[in-house]
Amino acid sequence: YARSLERTEAFFWQFCDQYLELVKTRAYGSRGDDAARSAQAALQLTLSTLLRLFAPFLPFVTEEVWSWWQSGSVHRAPWPNASQLRDAAADGNPLAYAMGAEILSAARRAKTESKRSLKWPVDVIDVTDTTPRTEAFQSVLEDVREAANATSVSVAVGAEASVAVTLANDPDAG
């Protein structure tokens, strides 16, 4: 019981910290309707699955949230089957998500270390990594750029993986 709850909570917080931040602006339509629908569908599937996972531990809360957008009871809802989840993730590359989360974390870390707000603008994020990783990253590059509030993201292939974040200058320091 405790281990199941611990793993579900860990996934929930990781999802909120990383994925939700990566797709938030796209879900609101920053890159058009098709991109927004794609992000919203992924978020909807994840919320539905998370509610089912949390239902045994938080029965009343999950039932209430479920009723806001679904009919019936979360406790009687079928689990998503493996083929549904595979189909939903068919175009996704787990490496792309991992790269996006890693690079967004580097941008956040740079802002925190400089005592800046997470909304502080970034001039450029320079990413160097292997060919397979940089190719995977291309599919989430715009999500990372928007989430980090970066003007640009440059990607180069190299043997040593690195992420360098250059924050924008303080407009009041001038």
Residues covered by each model-derived region:
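Feature 926 captures the class I aminoacyl-tRNA synthetase adenylation module centered on the KMSKS loop
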Residues: Y1-G174
